[in-house]
């Protein structure tokens, strides 16, 4: 609300200082553009509709307007296309002078609803000005007694451009007496100085003419020149000295023309013409010589032109005192212009609506801007309207206000309002400006319901029970009776694929919202819809709000192992060389979790291993690595069970079974492990059955062979002579005949076990290798025939 002004209890005020940069129905962001100066009128700057994300024709529908400070408009808006154009050619030097960067502020006003958008246009400098010396010829008197190394300041060149386009360097024409030194000043300017290289002789050369060149940094660069006339004078012992090196003075901007500003004073200890002093401006600009003049004899500086604080706040110049012998001294004069309250505030009306519907609170009546070119308290302003009126002044952007209805208007009580807007500054004396407007009230019957919030956010945990109450929306109507009775409804969703009717319902009387079914976070994380509130007036009015439902994740999904596959097919066996170093990467368990957040954070650990301590699992990435060096004593086959666990509450887990085979080299074959299913008990039982069957068949076969040999031996023993044994001539191997009389055989039998991929065992029985003897009692070597084996398979 407004703050009362002293001595004005009948007015309400809003202090602009407190509410600077406060935005109403608009964001605080500023759109910024830049354009080169001197571009033609109508040049394209930007497309506001595109940059602001507005639809085609929305700027025209909302009556978009460009507002600038004061009455000067530099920009224009094409509402249909949204293009922002230059209204006229802009000269950076005229608008900003030596201020860099040069920024022009503007605002865009939108209606329905009212919205302000702050904008900045930066004028970029082009090198359209060349350096310029204020004097075509610079006179410099130098005593012939000056020592080498003495420096003599020269007058600088002026360049209206800024930055790199202003003066960057000076040069002097070639000569044998001087060279040029450029000094960088704290104000950013560069000052040329002549430095004496060798002693001067007036009798040999009484004067010298040089050319001073100033070069800017533009592309292409521009130059300016001035002639330097050096007059060599007789030896002068003393240099003029000012009483102060720097003079400072404050001058009110309303000081009359011709008034004395300040007097500078210097003295010279020489006598005669060498002691006579003459004062003049040394380093100065056009603005200085237009505003001030100096008495060459007395050193008085007087006002030549009326000062204006709003244009120039301070002046800096160098004053030179020269004696008759050519020597000179210099001092600096700083003149600060003091602001006085000589400008009344200005009010610029941007939007005015004369007809306002009754019972329409916060309806915009007018939009206007205020300004005061003064500074300090003289430029601070307060804005107010009369008291006891149902209207409110609301600051929007800096020095922009909106006049709107504060409460319900009743046309039957009062059909017309005369409002006086008063803008007062805080200077001494205070100046003010008044603006009168007339507002007519149009008759209506009711007010639309208004939601307590423009948007609602509801949280529902997944796997909820159907018909769960998830939240409420609420709207109120400023009317009474049936006009204030509000009913709620779900509006058609903007997303045609959202089955809103099967997700939520609303109680039409109280706005309670219910979930119609159990929600699944993995299928639907969030959804939004609009609800409407309609009163029962005639005609009925309604409003709407946005409801956003966020489904909270529950830990209802266990981790799923992607690798190694756990689908009951052939097991995946990892080969590890026995020469592997500790930390050797065996494999990596890859798993995912359908949940989110910490419910999907997975950790890995080794749950079971054939030989604990041989392998390890990294907790965060599932990498299976060797924990130590492998040895020949380590079993060749290993079975690892890796546990994958999420971070939910309660946690869920899954296991992955790995088979590892230790090999001496990757080139040798390996036997797959018999287990395909993770059930260890079933695999152990199958192994027992296979061993028992193998032992039984082997025993039966061995018994049959022994019986056959015994029968043959018995038959031969009958025909053999006493103490003598005979070996048949056929291919029967002699090593199967018991010649020692102990009736035992020395032949060994062996078998292999072949494990097929179908997890069913196959046995391969091998017949002993029978060597061919060269002859009885020869004692020759035997040769193994590997092709004489018989295979027997059992499934």
Curated annotation (Swiss-Prot):
* A GO cellular-component term linked to this record: plasma membrane
User: Recorded GO terms, molecular function?
Assistant: calcium ion binding
Cytoplasmic compartment: which residues?
A: 712-795
GO term, biological process aspect, one: homophilic cell adhesion via plasma membrane adhesion molecules
Report the membrane topology from the UniProt record. Answer: Single-pass type I membrane protein
Composition bias, Polar residues:
781-795
Q: What CDD domains does the record tag this protein with?
A: Cadherin_repeat
Q: Where in the cell is it found?
A: Cell membrane
Keywords, sorted A to Z: Calcium, Cell adhesion, Cell membrane, Glycoprotein, Membrane, Repeat, Signal, Transmembrane, Transmembrane helix
Instruction: State the superkingdom.
Output: Eukaryota
Q: Spell out which residues lie on the membrane's Extracellular side.
A: 30-690
Q: Membrane-spanning residues where?
A: 691-711
In this chain the Cadherin domain maps to 30-133, 134-242, 243-347, 348-451, 452-561, 568-671
Region: Disordered; residue ranges are 776-795
Glycosylation site positions: 169, 184, 418, 436, 567
For this UniProt entry, which residues form the secretion signal? 1-29
Q: Which Pfam families match?
A: Cadherin, Cadherin_2, Cadherin_C_2
- Role played: Potential calcium-dependent cell-adhesion protein. May be involved in the establishment and maintenance of specific neuronal connections in the brain.
Q: What is this protein called?
A: Protocadherin beta-17
